[in-house]
């Protein structure tokens, strides 16, 4: 068995990204039949891995601000993705509420010194 190697993981940025201020007013959106069925499938979180041949400083000062700006602008058209799901007591139905004070998505950026190709390989 191969010797275990300690690898470091460091959070380099955590922020909430919302649509540009004042661009989307408070909006309630009713759920469709399909939306209601999906409520019981569980919470979805996405994780993306990228190998970047640039220094961390370049990434945090150049690339990351552009990624956040792009995500913010995409929320102009897809603001329910930055909204909250509210489930009032019966007989009321669940709905999505976008509120400028609470509408955002959490973005966490992490770097690691682990071997990228080894981490992404299928070891099954």
Predicted regions and their residues:
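Non-catalytic N-terminal regions of enzymes
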Residues: 1-124
């Amino acid at each position: 068995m191969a010797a275990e190697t300690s690898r470091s993981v460091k959070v380099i940025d955590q922020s909430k990204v919302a649509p540009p201020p004042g661009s989307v007013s408070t909006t309630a959106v009713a759920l469709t039949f399909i939306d209601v069925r999906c409520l019981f499938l569980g919470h979805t979180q996405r994780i993306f891995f990228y190998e970047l041949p640039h220094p961390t400083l370049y990434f945090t000062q150049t690339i990351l601000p552009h990624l956040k700006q792009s995500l913010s602008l995409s929320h102009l058209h897809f603001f329910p993705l930055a909204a909250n799901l509210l489930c009032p007591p019966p007989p009321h139905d669940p709905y999505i509420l976008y509120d400028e004070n609470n509408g955002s998505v959490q973005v966490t950026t992490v770097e690691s010194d682990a071997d990228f190709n080894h981490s992404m390989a299928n070891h099954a």
